[in-house]
């Protein structure tokens, strides 16, 4: 017994020394990530300065990509005025530099920060669509071209983030993509918000069909989804129950076939499909309202684990599926529902 304790002590010291030697040179091991796939994490606009924690999460979660947001300050939900927060952008650039040093791919996302972050981006409904697109291109995207994409090897650029009230403007988006292509040679991503359909209401299906057949989606490289599908109403669904629910959701008996709809999206656009923001809160009912980290005050690691396992097992083998981005990484709040609480 004494010998074993000595051996354990020696190994512990060795591991600590080994870790110390490699501090500051975090290199994600991406060997388990399939070639051409993305295994990413999203950083929030207020945590881009947590460089050490972001790098630690990249290593812990074996990521090959990080989604770095650039804060776009917007005074209210109907505003067409917008400006990049330069102080936050400088922090983001430092993070980008550190990630690229470690061969971690970077996706840049101009992120709408409405009313000091008190209003979600899906609520943005500009009063003048022409002014919105002019400022989005010449004030926001142009700043990103000048200060980031022209200077750093950026893997991807999200040109939209859940703009549900602007996605109808097909000609404007087509023009925006052309504008982007003139100055940026990396991957152009359009990120749409998740959607609902219900077998008992055909109007939802009609909206979905309209959504996936927007002509401009064929002009981007990757179609990204902020993915918070309401899958299961059970407090603690098993792995098999979650898996089955991806083909027929049980919340309000909607019967939404998420997997089939993702394939429809791919076929309509001809583009890979990517979950550009995804997680399952480690709470009971976490798969009923995954967009709500406070859906329940009862912690459940199994809900998160079963949710992730089911999604990965179903979607990762699909050739059209590009990968996941974890919402979120880089946070020092160890008890948050969106922290990944399992080693798997």
PLM-predicted stretches and their roles:
Residues 18-30:
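Sec-dependent signal peptide cleavage junction
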Residues 28-63:
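Boundary/entry segment of secreted carbohydrate-active catalytic domains
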Residues 45-59, 133-148, 200-214, 308-314:
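Short, acidic/polar
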Residues 61-79, 90-166, 280-287, 327-333:
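Substrate-binding cleft and catalytic face of glycoside hydrolase catalytic domains
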Residues 88-89, 109, 184-189, 213, ...:
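Glycoside hydrolase catalytic-domain groove-lining segments
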Residues 108-112, 158-162, 168, 177-208, ...:
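Aromatic-lined carbohydrate-recognition surfaces of secreted/lumenal glycan-active proteins
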Residues 176, 194-226, 230, 283-289, ...:
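Substrate-binding cleft/loops of secretory-pathway carbohydrate-active enzymes
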Residues 286, 290-344:
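Aromatic-rich peripheral "rim/lid" segments of glycoside hydrolase catalytic domains that contact
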């Amino acid at each position: 017994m004494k010998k074993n304790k000595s051996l354990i002590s020696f190994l512990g010291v060795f591991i600590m020394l080994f870790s110390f030697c490699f501090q500051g040179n975090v290199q994600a091991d991406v060997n388990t990530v399939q070639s051409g796939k993305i295994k990413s994490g999203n950083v929030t606009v207020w945590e881009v300065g947590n460089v050490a924690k972001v790098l630690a999460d990249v290593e812990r979660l074996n990521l090959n990509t990080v989604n770095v947001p650039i804060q776009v300050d917007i005074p209210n939900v109907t505003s067409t005025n917008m400006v990049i927060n330069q102080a936050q952008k400088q922090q983001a650039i430092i993070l980008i530099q550190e990630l690229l040093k470690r061969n971690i791919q970077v996706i840049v996302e101009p992120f709408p920060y409405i009313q000091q972050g008190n209003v979600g981006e899906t609520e943005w409904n500009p009063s003048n669509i022409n002014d919105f697109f002019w400022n989005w291109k010449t004030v926001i995207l142009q700043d990103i071209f000048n200060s980031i994409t022209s200077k750093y090897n950026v893997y991807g650029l999200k040109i939209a983030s859940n703009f549900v009230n602007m996605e109808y403007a097909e000609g404007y988006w087509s023009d925006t993509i052309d504008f982007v292509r003139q100055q940026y040679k990396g991957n152009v991503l359009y990120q749409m918000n998740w959607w609902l359909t219900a077998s008992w209401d055909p109007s939802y299906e009609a909206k979905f069909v309209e959504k996936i057949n927007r002509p401009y989606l064929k002009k981007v490289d990757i179609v990204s989804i902020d993915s918070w599908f309401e899958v299961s109403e059970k407090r603690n669904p098993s792995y098999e129950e979650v898996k089955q629910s991806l083909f027929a959701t049980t919340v309000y008996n909607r019967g939404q076939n998420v997997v089939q709809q993702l394939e429809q999206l791919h076929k309509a656009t001809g583009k890979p499909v990517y979950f550009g923001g995804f997680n399952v809160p480690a709470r009971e009912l976490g798969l009923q309202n995954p967009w709500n980290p406070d859906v329940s005050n009862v912690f459940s690691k199994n809900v998160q684990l079963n949710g992730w396992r089911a999604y990965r097992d179903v979607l990762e083998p699909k050739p059209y599926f590009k990968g996941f981005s974890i919402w979120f990484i880089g946070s020092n709040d160890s008890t948050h529902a969106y922290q990944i609480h399992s080693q798997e």
